[in-house]
Amino acid sequence: MAAISDVDSKKNIIIKGAKLHNLKNIDVIIPRNKLVVVTGLSGSGKSSLAFDTLYAEGQRRYVESLSSYARQFLGKLDKPKVDYIKGIAPAIAIEQKVNSTNPRSTVGTTTEIYDYLKLLYARIGKTVSPISGEEVKKHTVSDVTDHVKSFPEGTKLLLLAPITIKENRDPLKSLQLFSKQGYARIKYQGKVMRIDQVPEDIGRQFDLVVDRIVVKTDEDFYNRLGNAVDNAFFEGKGQCALEDLGQDTITVFSNQFEMDGMKFLEPNVHLFSFNNPYGACPKCEGYGDVIGIDEDLVIPDTSLSIYESAVFPWRGETMSWYKEQLVNSAYKFDFPIHKPWYQLSERQKQLVWDGNDHFIGIHKFFQQLEEKSYKIQNRVMLSRYRGKTKCSVCKGKRLRKEANYVKVGDTSISDLIELPIKKLIPFFDKLQLSEHDTEIANRLLKEIVTRLDFLNKVGLSYLTLNRKSNTLSGGESQRINLATSLGSSLVGSMYILDEPSIGLHPKDTENLIDVLQSLRNLGNTVIVVEHDEDIMKAADEIIDIGPEAGTLGGHVVAHGTFNEILMSTSLTAEYLNGTRSIEVPTARRNSKNYIQIKGARENNLKNIDVTFPLNVLTVITGVSGSGKSTLVRRILYPSILKEVGGYGEKAGQFTKIEGKYGHIKHVEFVDQNPIGRSSRSNPVTYIKAYDDIRSLFASQKLSKIRGYQAKHFSFNVDGGRCEKCKGEGEITVEMQFMADVHLECDVCEGKRFKKDILEVQFEGKNVDDVLNMTIDDAIQHFKNHKQQKIVTKLQPLQDVGLGYVTLGQSSSTLSGGEAQRIKLASFLVKGETKEKALFIFDEPTTGLHFHDIKKLLKSFDELIEKGHSVIVIEHNIELIKCADYLIDLGPEGGENGGFLVAEGTPEEIADRIDSHTAKYLKEKL
């Protein structure tokens, strides 16, 4: 390798002496405008290099170039611990955080597609009257003069303005005013008469003759006519008429935007914005839902028919009268009372809610209860069915009704954003516009179509633009950010992505690789922190950080193309070239216990029956959007939680739950949310090992002499902790106009405790030294000094592959995958209980190297051996091949998903032709 000083910084990004966290003063050269993968064990220092060093420096330099006024909103960025970085480009990081909790944020607004749609509808939308279906137009002065031009020269016309005199005015006085303004005639009851000759008893409605016209062709005539038409529109309050005296025909013009007796709003951008009071539905203010009668509570079981009392409040002696009304009169309007609710058409469902002349609908039923809410039983009844419900005015469309009269290609904007992306693309491809509209819309359509195309490529074709951002999974929101970045087509930037393959089925990974390569081909450097073998194969260069994790990591162990990496001796290379592998179990476990969910039909699930075997490793697979999370998160978890006596969210729509699961006493859903928000929360407090460590320090000789107890070694209560920073180790300085600055506490120097507490040592280490040890080091230290109780509690953290984390590392700095594994470890600590639990994991391999997946599988086996059950949602084939039982949903995502494609052992599924998972599974088996 050439000396680092000789490398050309125009073609490479040069990092010299990176020493942040566990990085061992390393030099790295990253080629510019290439796709580079950074890989290595969890905790080896990949993120420290990619995010905390490269991104931090790219961001910092960009911010430094801004004015001080702009900088105050961006906060101060620390310089990373590195000698220097040359050739760096402006950095964009795309992380896996589900970033939006805003209920107004949707896929359309995040990707900016909705902004372009608003413009499109405002510019070329045609307003259509809901009464006649005709296009609403307003006339201008030139429309009237053009009409006059169509008559032959010499034709006699009258230009009229319709007048209506108000109740409190005298018609004769009003006519005198017109006379003073220079008007001489009116037309009343079909006759033209002079104003000074009108009868005394004239009515309040007549036409004012603004001008008598003899058609000519010269310029002056049309100039005079233009002024006259202006006056006619003014006097007629926006209306005027041309009467052809020869043919006795009248043509009416209006410069108001109206038709069929309705006034319409002229399209503008704000009309289509649900975040603007002008365009938002007045009832729900643009949220799409309101607090009201919750449909799911009123009809909790959609597999029942009206006859079987699907409408829950219409049960019991008093209320069944409402049901009888509908059942007895259904034949009059041909309503199927024996059909299950979920099979009814939208119109039939709406009828039950709205009612008709023969029966009272659900809406009216609750209205009657509200009118008599002074009765206690009515108030109880109402409170039982209250919840978030679709807004009754806009039907969840978020916009005022006038916005939906505007159409492009016969479709309103609300209907458009309800279509999945894969149907939107053909809609715009087939859109036929006039030449004039095409010229206006061309650039907008180009932006819309490219962005839709990117969403399609990153595997999100099943989403609708109206989907709320806060209901997306981590992988989905990351890929939406990726598509948004692509849509803005920046050039010469540095994109740093954190495991974009999360939540992607191997089938979708191929498209993702195309997207990353197209980002590179635009002229950007794309740096990806990734463990996925397919993405590594597609990379131009791979940087492997290792050899192990934590203090044993932080070196560059291999650097080069995929084939060069295969020749090296790093752990990554050994798993890639087959020296090491994750073994396929020789026998699959089977079990007599199971949970069966019948008739699952939430979101896109197609009324399926699914059996989950217990006491084994059950894995749910399927492409993105096939319904895995819906089945497990929305149906299995809340329903089994209720069965074992827990209190959970309301379950999604399904018929019933049955099976042999009496031995399960707890249900744990282990997701990737942080284990604690407070900066004092850390792994060792979470698994309750810190209590033993404090007791150990309190039992030392010096502690006894000074009277210290366990609480003196806690940084959560007063006593031993530093008084100035309250055990935080840092002081937060609030800057009025800038971001808060965190400074190391000058009293304890970041050690959290008072000086005299730190004088207490156990085998040469004080409490601060212990908190700064990695878990691997701490286990060794306590083992050597016979502290088995502490070792037993720390061991599971090492088993799940977190040996590199320090005992006192703040929870807020842990990644989603790490937080999930700490939760897993805390359950392994409790392990040997009589009460058996069901563990549900959502993509536990996030952020895991092959070597770590091996450890994770060992932890799962340990839980199962202790009699617990494990159900996992997963895309990683290495984990899928080790399952005892697979449940494959699909075949595609979105509308074409939600079916049970296959279930059984991996061997049974590998032979299936109709399953996407089978193809990839076969290669591994």
Predicted feature locations:
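Conserved phosphate-binding elements of NTP-dependent enzyme cores
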Residues: 1-925
